Amino acid sequence: MSPQTETKASVGFKAGVKDYKLTYYTPEYQTLDTDILAAFRVTPQPGVPPEEAGAAVAAESSTGTWTTVWTDGLTSLDRYKGRCYHIDPVPGEENQYICYVAYPLDLFEEGSVTNMFTSIVGNVFGFKALRALRLEDLRIPVAYIKTFQGPPHGIQVERDKLNKYGRPLLGCTIKPKLGLSAKNYGRAVYECLRGGLDFTKDDENVNSQPFMRWRDRFLFCAEALYKAQAETGEIKGHYLNATAGTCEEMIKRAVFARELGVPIVMHDYLTGGFTANTSLAHYCRDNGLLLHIHRAMHAVIDRQKNHGMHFRVLAKALRLSGGDHIHAGTVVGKLEGERDITLGFVDLLRDDYTEIDANRGIYFTQSWVSTPGVLPVASGGIHVWHMPALTEIFGDDSVLQFGGGTLGHPWGNAPGAVANRVALEACVQARNEGRDLAREGNTIIREASKWSPELAAACEVWKEIKFEFPAVDTLDKDKKKG
C-alpha cells in the first residue's frame, strides 16, 4: 500500500485527549526540500512547556484538533501532519521561544497565498494555550514557488519600459490625500512630473469617493502624464489605484487604465486581499501594466514584536502573489523600520537568493529561482536631507517617494520636484565618484544647493525636521549581556 493511501484504521480507535507533543513534536525529523518551513515566536501560557506549545502550533495549523477523532484512522497523518522539529529560546526574553515547524507541501493549494495563510496563520493565533504567537519567517520551497506567476514584470523589465537606469526612481504621493477635485488632483500630478519626478501616486485610501470618482481621476491624471512626457522627453507614470469593493470593479478600473495607455496601476494588497491581488497581477502581466503595491494595514499585523506576523513574511507573500513595487519602510523617515531588519526584507524582495542571516532577522535560506524581483519603495516623512542616506541604504533598485517632501516646498509642486531630482542626481554622481554618502551626505546636498535655488529653499525649510523615536521591531539580544 502506498504512503498516500495507507491508513491506520486497523490500529483501532481510542477516544480522549492527549498531549500534542506526543504526535507533533518530532525533534528527530529531517526537513525535506519540498517542506514549507515556518519560524514562530511562541509565548506559552504559564505552565505550558515549550515542546507542548510548539507542537500545538504545528497541530492546529495542519491536521490536529483538540481531541482524538476516529477519522484520523482514515488517512496517513505521518504524511500530512505539521511537525515542530526544533525549539530555541529567545535571547533576553523570558518564556519566549522560536519554534520551527515543517509542513508537507501537499497541505497547500498550488498558486494560492490565500490558502497558505489560511492554514499557517489561521485559528492557531487564537489558541488559549498560547499567550502570544508571531510568525517570524517562512521558507517557501522551489516546488511551491513555481506554482505562482509572481510579479507581473520585475525590476529589469520595468527599467526597460521606462528607459531609466543607474539610479533610484523618484516618486511623490499627491497630498492632501483626500478632498481634491479630479482636475486639481491632475494639476498637482502634472506639476510634479514636469519638475522631474518619474512617478506620482494615488494615496492608499483614494478609491472612488464623492469628491473624486475614479474615472474622472484616471482621465485627468492621464492627461497630466502625457503633457509632462511631451515637455520633458521622459517616460512618466502615475499609480492609478484600482483597489475597489469587488474584484470585478477592480479589474474594470485596470482595464480602463490600460485603455488610457498609462504604464502602471496600484493595489492595496492587504485590505484588498490576496485573491484579488493575484488576479490583478495576472491581468497586469497579460496587458503590459506595471503594478504598484501599497501595504496599508500592515502595521496592524506586524507592529507588535510578540504577536502577529513579521513584514518579511508579508513581503514574501507579495512576491508570490504579484507586484512590481511594494512599500518597505524608510529607516530614516516617520514610519517604523530598523535598518538591518529593513535591509533583510528588502533583499528578500529583490534578490534571487538569500542566506540565513541572524543579524538581519532572516531565519531561512530562500531561493526564488526565476521569480522576478520587486522594487522596494521608501516613503513616509522623507525630504531632501534624507536623500544621501536613502541612496546609500536602498541603492539603485528602489523607488524613493517624497509626498510632503515635494508638495510642501515653499515655491510649489514643480520646484519641490526639481529639488528632489537635483538632490538625487547629486547623490548618485557623488557615489559614482567614490564619495562616502553616509559621512559626506550633508556636504553633498549643500554643494548641490549652490546651483539649484529650488534645492536651497527645500534645504532651508526641512533643516530641523527629524523623527527620532526608537524602533519597536528590533533584533533579539541577550539583555543580561547588554
Curated annotation (Swiss-Prot):
Query: Its catalytic activity?
Result: 2 (2R)-3-phosphoglycerate + 2 H(+) = D-ribulose 1,5-bisphosphate + CO2 + H2O; D-ribulose 1,5-bisphosphate + O2 = 2-phosphoglycolate + (2R)-3-phosphoglycerate + 2 H(+)
Q: Which residues bind substrate?
A: 123, 173, 177, 295, 327, 379
Q: Please state what class of enzyme this protein is.
A: lyase
Listed cofactors: Mg(2+)
Q: Where in the cell is it found?
A: Plastid, Chloroplast
Where are residues bearing N6,N6,N6-trimethyllysine located in the sequence? Answer: 14
Positions of modified residues (N6-carboxylysine): 201
Q: Which Pfam families match?
A: RuBisCO_large (PF00016), RuBisCO_large_N (PF02788)
Site positions for Transition state stabilizer:
334
**Free-text description of this protein's post-translational modifications in UniProt:** The disulfide bond which can form in the large chain dimeric partners within the hexadecamer appears to be associated with oxidative stress and protein turnover.
Q: Which residues form the propeptide?
A: 1-2
Going by the entry's taxonomy, the superkingdom of the source organism is recorded as Eukaryota
Q: Where is the active site?
A: 175 (proton acceptor), 294 (proton acceptor)
- Family matches, as InterPro entries: RuBisCO, RuBisCo_large_chain_AS, RuBisCO_lsu_C, RuBisCO_lsu_C_sf, RuBisCO_lsu_fd_N, RuBisCO_lsu_N_sf, RuBisCO_lsuI
Q: Which SUPFAM superfamilies match?
A: RuBisCo, C-terminal domain (SSF51649), RuBisCO, large subunit, small (N-terminal) domain (SSF54966)
Asked if the Swiss-Prot or TrEMBL record annotates the protein with the keyword Chloroplast, the reply is yes
Q: How does it assemble?
A: Heterohexadecamer of 8 large chains and 8 small chains; disulfide-linked. The disulfide link is formed within the large subunit homodimers.
Provide the function of this protein.
RuBisCO catalyzes two reactions: the carboxylation of D-ribulose 1,5-bisphosphate, the primary event in carbon dioxide fixation, as well as the oxidative fragmentation of the pentose substrate in the photorespiration process. Both reactions occur simultaneously and in competition at the same active site.
Q: What is this protein called?
A: Ribulose bisphosphate carboxylase large chain
Origin species, per record, is Stegnosperma halimifolium
Coding gene? rbcL
